[in-house]
Amino acid sequence: MEALGKLKQFDAYPKTLEDFRVKTCGGATVTIVSGLLMLLLFLSELQYYLTTEVHPELYVDKSRGDKLKINIDVLFPHMPCAYLSIDAMDVAGEQQLDVEHNLFKQRLDKDGIPVSSEAERHELGKVEVTVFDPDSLDPDRCESCYGAEAEDIKCCNTCEDVREAYRRRGWAFKNPDTIEQCRREGFSQKMQEQKNEGCQVYGFLEVNKVAGNFHFAPGKSFQQSHVHVHDLQSFGLDNINMTHYIQHLSFGEDYPGIVNPLDHTNVTAPQASMMFQYFVKVVPTVYMKVDGEVLRTNQFSVTRHEKVANGLLGDQGLPGVFVLYELSPMMVKLTEKHRSFTHFLTGVCAIIGGMFTVAGLIDSLIYHSARAIQKKIDLGKTT
């Protein structure tokens, strides 16, 4: 018993008799409010604990021979799909000219609404032109390429075949009305029909994981004296409006929390024949989810430059939208981890202890202030 008596001396929480305790309305109000605040803070701490935290690390990128996937969704409200060409090239010398695989073009009217394709007839003003039936032609025919024949191109049975043969030769495709295939297919009428339309380009490119560029520009692209050029003979520089809206542009798959800086970027061309250049720095990124799934992707930063392209060759540039990218030699590794349970317990204890302490101080202040005022009232000293 004597030992228990000595032990009681260490009690930091001495108790008072129930008869000496006073309960007040102010104390009840403080208790209820502090209890609700404590509950809200606890739920907030619990929600924070149930989320994952991401730990970044930096490494040297040692990956070799990988492909880079570029996701694209860009709108050109004043550039018809028939005029627009998409090309990609890199420092290794690989080129993808007038890319069509994995990339799609959607025609848009002047209000930005998708235009449904009409397979049988096109309306040009008040004149209706019936599109020819290709099945009516001899399937074994071999039509002229108009001087652009090559070892692998002996016959040009369609207007597109002639354009491709001209492109390989590096010749400008000036007057389609002199080409029988184009006249038969109504090429000029189609171009005229789409004159006031826009175009949405969406899909993806797969390129080598080296520095390079891809661009959207009017005219058929080809090589001339080892220089990449576009045939703009039939356009006129004053008619080229490169206003564009980038709905989405990313390098690889999205991961939680990623920010693609070019998403929802709207750029209005201040004048005709503008050249827009986006200089992109791509940072390889590995995102490791808490369940063990590994996502290899990229994040990037970008700066923009624009100028008027008055010429078709040389330093004056080419009208269009150019994305020039280079890859960082460093790789970022992002790892998801569960939050510490001991940290959660510490936070909960801090909330409970802090609220009890603050509530006790407020209750004591209210109680003693009320008693002091009541004493003055009883003594008749209040004014």
From Swiss-Prot:
Its main location: endoplasmic reticulum. One of its GO terms (biological process) is retrograde vesicle-mediated transport, Golgi to endoplasmic reticulum. Coiled coil: none annotated. The chain crosses the membrane at residues 26-46, 342-362. Glycans are attached at residues 241, 266. It comes from the Eukaryota. Keywords: Acetylation, Endoplasmic reticulum, ER-Golgi transport, Glycoprotein, Golgi apparatus, Membrane, Phosphoprotein, Transmembrane, Transmembrane helix, Transport. GO terms for cellular component: COPII-coated ER to Golgi transport vesicle; endoplasmic reticulum; endoplasmic reticulum membrane; endoplasmic reticulum-Golgi intermediate compartment membrane; Golgi membrane; membrane; retrograde transporter complex, Golgi to ER; transporter complex. The modification N-acetylmethionine is found at residue 1. The record marks 8 as: Ubiquitinated. Changing residue 297 to K: In a colorectal cancer sample; somatic mutation. It is found in: Endoplasmic reticulum-Golgi intermediate compartment membrane; Golgi apparatus, cis-Golgi network membrane; Endoplasmic reticulum membrane. Residues 47-341 are lumenal. PANTHER family: ENDOPLASMIC RETICULUM-GOLGI INTERMEDIATE COMPARTMENT PROTEIN, ENDOPLASMIC RETICULUM-GOLGI INTERMEDIATE COMPARTMENT PROTEIN 3. Possible role in transport between endoplasmic reticulum and Golgi. Positively regulates trafficking of the secretory proteins SERPINA1/alpha1-antitrypsin and HP/haptoglobin. Belongs to the ERGIC family. Forms homodimers. May form a heteromeric complex composed of ERGIC1, ERGIC2 and ERGIC3. Within the complex, the interaction with ERGIC1 is direct. Interacts with ERGIC1/ERGIC32. Interacts with ERGIC2, the interaction is required for the stable expression of both proteins. Interacts with MARCHF2. Interacts with alpha1-antitrypsin/SERPINA1 and HP/haptoglobin. This is Endoplasmic reticulum-Golgi intermediate compartment protein 3.
